[in-house]
């Protein structure tokens, strides 16, 4: 576990988020370290993919800002998504292996399962369960597959109560 750190007032600390999937880097992008308490790492970054991406239930686009919460002891990441002018769109939650921060790189392995929670909390959508089943993780690493499934259930339970905002508070 790396030591807790918090940028001093007026100073920011940069790092790189390296999101991998099935052993390959999916995307790498620079982010500003907001807080690191030794367990949870919070970063802020603009939408990093080229152009807009419409998921049907939300549209991510240039100018959006994501405040991303990663845990060293939990199997998920929660990304608060806001427009450039600060309007909350919702929370995109990735099921991941616990995050590792070393040498300025935050490494996160995406395990296919996702959860979307709308800004008003009215929509809670489980996503990509078919991709997860097709990934073969349950056969290769049953313990990880079980942890991922439990993490999705935990996040959904938090999202359907006031638990998600309490978790991020």
Give the ranges of each region predicted by the language model.
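A short, polar/proline- and glycine-enriched secondary-structure boundary/capping micro-motif
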Residues: 52-58, 103-104, 135-138
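Short acidic, glycine-rich loop/turn motifs
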Residues: 18-24, 47, 82-84, 97-99, ...
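Cysteine/selenocysteine-centered motifs that mediate thiol-based redox chemistry or coordinate metal-sulfur cofactors
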Residues: 151-169
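Short, well-ordered strand-loop elements centered on a beta-strand within folded domains, enriched
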Residues: 41-44, 87-94, 122-130
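Short acidic-glycine loop/turn motifs at beta-strand connectors
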Residues: 36-39, 84-85, 118-122
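Phosphate/ribose-recognition catalytic cores of enzymes acting on nucleotide-derived substrates
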Residues: 56-100, 106, 111-113
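Charge-rich, low-complexity N-terminal segments
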Residues: 1-65
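A hydrophobic, small-residue-rich beta->alpha segment in the mid-to-C-terminal subdomain
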Residues: 111-154
